[in-house]
C-alpha cells in the first residue's frame, strides 16, 4: 500500500521534475518558477532544503540530472572525493551546470580516516557532501539549442551529457568529469520529426534512448570505428506522443543478462516494455562486418521488439515512468493524477501492485522517480502542477 511520507511545497508554480543523485541522498527539482531546489533525502532531518539555484535561467527549468560518480555507480574511483554536480535544462534553450567547492572540513576528515573502514568513510563523505553548509555555484552555461531544452541526462560515467529540445535535435556534450570546465559538442542527432520530449541513458553502457512527439522512441550508439553517433533502433507502437522512457538496471532482481529492456509512457494511455536480445544484435554486427563498406548502414544496429503492454489503468496521458534498480518494479504517473506501481510475476507477466488516486489532489503529476534515502530506504518521488514534491513509501 502506497503511503505519503512527506509533501514539500517546493515551488510557487509547476514542478516539472524531481531526480535524485545516484549515490548520495540528494534530490533536485525543476520548476516553471525558473528555479531548481536541492534537498537532503533524510526523513530523520525532515528533508531539509539545501540550496535554491536561481537567476541562471530566464524561463522554466524543465529538467534536472545529477552527474554520476567518477568511474560509474558500480565502480567509483576510491581515492577521489567526487563532488556532486547538477545539470539543469531550461525553456530558455540553455543548460546550466552547478556544483560545490571542496568542503573545508575534508582536510580534518582525511587525517582520521586511517582507522575507519570503507563504509564509515563513505558515510562521512556523504554527510559532508550533503551538508547545508555547502554553497552551490554556477559552473557553466551551455548554449546550442535553438528552442526549449526539454530534458538533460548524464551517461553512467559522467563524461557525456545529452540534451534534447523542441528544435527536434539531441546534442551530446563531452567533458572532463573531474573538472567540468569545458563542454564540447561531439554530436547533433536530428532523426526525430518533431519535438524530442525526453532522453535517458542506459545505467551501465553508452546507449541513449529518446522519446518524441512523433510517437517513436529512438536508440543511439557511438560507432566504434569512427566515433560517430547514429540511430541504431526505432521503436514504433505507441499511438501518441512518447513522454518518457526508463531502462531496466542490471542491478534489478528481474534483470536478464541476455536482454536490454526499456519501459515507455505515452499520450496513448499505455505503458509498454521493449526488449533487445543481445545475441541477435551481435549476429547483426557480425553480418554487417562482412558487407562492403558501400552498403553498410551501421555496425551497431539493434533488434528490438515490443515485449509487453502493462495492464491498462490510466485514463489520461502517461507523462512519466521509472524502473526501480532495487526491486525491478515499475512506477507510472501522469495527467490523471494516479501513482501506479507494477510488478513482474514469476511467469513473466506484469500486474498492478498498487494504485494511489489523486496523488497531488486535482493536479497533474509530471514526473515519478525511484530514489534512495540516507538510511538506504527506497522511496518514490513525484512532482506535480501544484508545485509540490511528494515522497512516498511504496
Curated annotation (Swiss-Prot):
Q: Which UniProt keywords apply?
A: Cytoplasm, Nucleus, Repeat, WD repeat
| CDD domains reported in the protein's UniProt record | WD40
User: Where is this chain's protein located in or outside the cell?
Assistant: Cytoplasm; Nucleus
Return one Gene Ontology term, BP aspect.
Answer: tRNA wobble uridine modification
- WD repeat segments run 10-49, 56-108, 144-184, 191-230, 237-284, 313-352, 359-394
Q: Could you give one GO CC term from the UniProt record?
A: nucleus
Principal location listed in the UniProt entry: cytoplasm
Keyword Nucleus found: yes
Which protein family is named in the record?
Belongs to the WD repeat CIA1 family.
> How does the record describe its quaternary structure?
Interacts with NAR1.
The record's function comment reads: Essential component of the cytosolic iron-sulfur (Fe/S) protein assembly machinery. Required for the maturation of extramitochondrial Fe/S proteins.
Q: What is this protein called?
A: Probable cytosolic iron-sulfur protein assembly protein 1
**Protein's organism:** Debaryomyces hansenii (strain ATCC 36239 / CBS 767 / BCRC 21394 / JCM 1990 / NBRC 0083 / IGC 2968) (Yeast)
